[in-house]
Amino acid sequence: MNKKLSVQEIILTLQKYWAEQGCMLMEAYDTEKGAGTMSPYTFLRAIGPEPWNAAYVEPSRRPADGRYGENPNRLYQHHQFQVVMKPSPENIQELYLGSLKALGIDPLEHDIRFVEDNWENPSMGCAGVGWEVWLDGMEVTQFTYFQQVGGLEVNPVTSEVTYGLERLSSYIQDVESVFDLEWGNGVSYGDIFREPEFEHSKYSFEESNQAMLEKMFNDFEAEANRLIEEGLVHPAYDYILKCSHTFNLLDARGTVSVTERAGFLSRIRNMARKVARAFVEEREKLGFPLLKNNEEEAK
């Protein structure tokens, strides 16, 4: 690698590469979430028989990981580049290695290891077999074949490739702190995100209102369940995401007991399962249109 790519150049390179592999380029979903997997572009689209190939950057908020902008690698909000392909191409690992090559990382010249790391998100009823991808000793990607989403079996097999953009960029730019990364045009990551990191950490650990958050969770849960009953899948899913983020804020404050924590997670999981079933039913009523489109293209 001669020229060190900025973060935005890394994003643009990955977008171009995966678009050439048949992925639609989506935008980040505008509700707080803890991982790119929780975007409806992955969570909902991974279930049911319809094909789906998409790539997008997803800001992911994890309140408990905030460190007031003082830790070089631990963040309240990090960015994932998410690729989801359904059905999974047989050569998905080769495609992934091709994406590294597009970034100037020749797999033949670097130590790239797929380390078994099966994945699960119990609160959303998700599980899969997968690997961490280590690049010269640093984990930069999570690679997963989904087995279950929202408590439903995933068929056809769906593959997910999740790049940790901060880690990958730190490797490419050879910096120790994410705040020293060049985002683009000479502007550093710290110039953009250090102050928000401090303020969100202060809120999460010191200023959040527990009583208000508990009421919000209850209200969001009630609305999500009501909307599922009304057949409004996507608004319902938004409220499930709000429940998840609200729980994460409560959890970060350290005021949730072990028993209460299990209860919150069970409530989120129940909603996720209901909305997953409702989504498949909705798509079936529509005649699984993307399946028809795919069959017509194959003729």
Curated annotation (Swiss-Prot):
PROSITE patterns of this UniProt entry? AA_TRNA_LIGASE_II_GLYAB
Gene3D superfamilies named in the record: Bira Bifunctional Protein, Domain 2, Class II aaRS and biotin synthetases, domain 2
Spell out the reaction equation it catalyses: tRNA(Gly) + glycine + ATP = glycyl-tRNA(Gly) + AMP + diphosphate
Q: Name one GO biological process term.
A: glycyl-tRNA aminoacylation
Subcellular location as annotated: Cytoplasm
Q: Name one Pfam family in it.
A: tRNA-synt_2e
**Chief localisation class:** cytoplasm
Does the entry feature the keyword ATP-binding, yes or no? Answer: yes
Instruction: Give a GO molecular function annotation for the protein.
Output: ATP binding
Q: Which UniProt keywords apply?
A: Aminoacyl-tRNA synthetase, ATP-binding, Cytoplasm, Ligase, Nucleotide-binding, Protein biosynthesis
According to its record, what are the GO cellular component terms?
cytosol
Name the domain of life: Bacteria
Q: Tell me which EC number(s) this protein carries.
A: 6.1.1.14
Query: Subunit structure of this entry?
Result: Tetramer of two alpha and two beta subunits.
Family the entry assigns:
Belongs to the class-II aminoacyl-tRNA synthetase family.
- Kindly provide the name given to this protein in its UniProt entry: Glycine--tRNA ligase alpha subunit
Native source organism of the sequence: Pediococcus pentosaceus (strain ATCC 25745 / CCUG 21536 / LMG 10740 / 183-1w)
List the top taxonomic levels of the source.
Answer: Bacteria, Bacillati, Bacillota, Bacilli, Lactobacillales
Q: Which gene encodes it?
A: glyQ
